[in-house]
Amino acid sequence: MLLIDIKDKELSQEEVEILEHPLVSGLILFSRNFHDKVQLEALVKSIRQRVKKPLLITVDQEGGRVQRFREGFTKLPAMQAFHTLAKNPQESTALARQTGWLMAAEMFALDIDLSFAPVLDLGHQCKAIGDRSFGENPDAMLPIAEAFIDGMREMGMATTGKHFPGHGHVLADSHLETPFDDRPKEAIFNRDILPFKQLISKGKLSAVMPAHVIYTQCDSQPASGSEYWLKQVLRNQLNFNGVIFSDDLGMKGAGFMGNFVERSEKAIHAGCDLLLLCNEPEGVIQVLDGLKYQPTKTQTERHISLMKRKTVRWNELEASPRYQQAQQRLTALQNEWLEYKAQHC
């Protein structure tokens, strides 16, 4: 039910006990949990061995500025780089697929189950999204996003489309406040929701993460706590039957829904299967003590479906010609992107 974080680069006994709580299903790792590849491998191994139940271990390893593990890992390009710098659509989709495959391979080699990717938000108006987006035009960005997903799926990693139904057209950052999107319903359904709709119809999304955004012309609650968005639209209209993650309930944008227990209750009632609660250790304890909920059999099955099913050895990965070629090209692309941004932004 809950995905939480840990404080540092080693696992404390107190954290072991919290992770063994029946309501905790997994954890998300951050840059503060990472020093180098050797340390990270030891940390993940410690989690797997000391916590006496299967845990979903996750990270945000999108690429560009949202890449928690850097030293010793491939410098992944920002998603906007594919469309902007590629010579033609064929090259942009090939690069995106390489990135999805390589990212998933590197995570599996460290025994990490999934990276929360890809971002399917349109546009770069929101600073929290920016170049994390594949583009502003749904028709142009969809093949690139789908190629990235196909790369992840080839490696066997579950995919998470975020931030439903679209976070790209608000100025506010939901890490800091609750954003309001005042556009007409038709604008959202005719543009922002299209990448989610089409990828769901093709069976390409294992999970969806809703936004902490209030779409004022549609509902009074943030999408992450909205029955309208999660049950009526996502489940019933789009026929999505995968996992629904809440975005981090510790973010300021979730504060609209009340205290931590109330946020969790509203997210569950709205339709979320797994809840992220990060950077709020006291909030985690409050939820574990105060949340009266037993995950359903369906929710448990959805949770298990996200776990890694392929073993990748780092030395074998590094020796692979495909990996070597992809790493070289993608590192160069991200360097090109940083130069491009320096000149044009």
UniProtKB/Swiss-Prot annotation:
Keyword RNA-binding: no
GO terms, molecular function: beta-N-acetylhexosaminidase activity
The enzyme's E.C. designation: 3.2.1.52
Active site residues of this protein: 175, 247
Keyword annotations from UniProtKB, A to Z: Cell cycle, Cell division, Cell shape, Cell wall biogenesis/degradation, Cytoplasm, Glycosidase, Hydrolase, Peptidoglycan synthesis
Pfam families per the UniProt record, alphabetical: Glyco_hydro_3
InterPro entries: Beta_hexosaminidase_bac (IPR022956), Glyco_hydro_3_AS (IPR019800), Glyco_hydro_3_N (IPR001764), Glyco_hydro_3_N_sf (IPR036962), Glycoside_hydrolase_SF (IPR017853), NagZ_Beta-hexosaminidase (IPR050226)
Site (Important for catalytic activity): 173
Binding positions for substrate per the UniProt entry: 60, 68, 132, 162-163
Metabolic or biological pathway: Cell wall biogenesis; peptidoglycan recycling
GO CC terms: cytoplasm
Leader peptide range in chain numbering: none
Any one biological process term the GO annotation gives: peptidoglycan biosynthetic process
Localization per record: Cytoplasm
Catalytic activity: Hydrolysis of terminal non-reducing N-acetyl-D-hexosamine residues in N-acetyl-beta-D-hexosaminides
Function description: Plays a role in peptidoglycan recycling by cleaving the terminal beta-1,4-linked N-acetylglucosamine (GlcNAc) from peptide-linked peptidoglycan fragments, giving rise to free GlcNAc, anhydro-N-acetylmuramic acid and anhydro-N-acetylmuramic acid-linked peptides.
Family assignment from sequence similarity: Belongs to the glycosyl hydrolase 3 family. NagZ subfamily.
PANTHER family named in the record: BETA-HEXOSAMINIDASE, BETA-HEXOSAMINIDASE-RELATED
HAMAP family the UniProt entry points to: NagZ
Name of the protein: Beta-hexosaminidase
Natural source organism: Actinobacillus pleuropneumoniae serotype 3 (strain JL03)
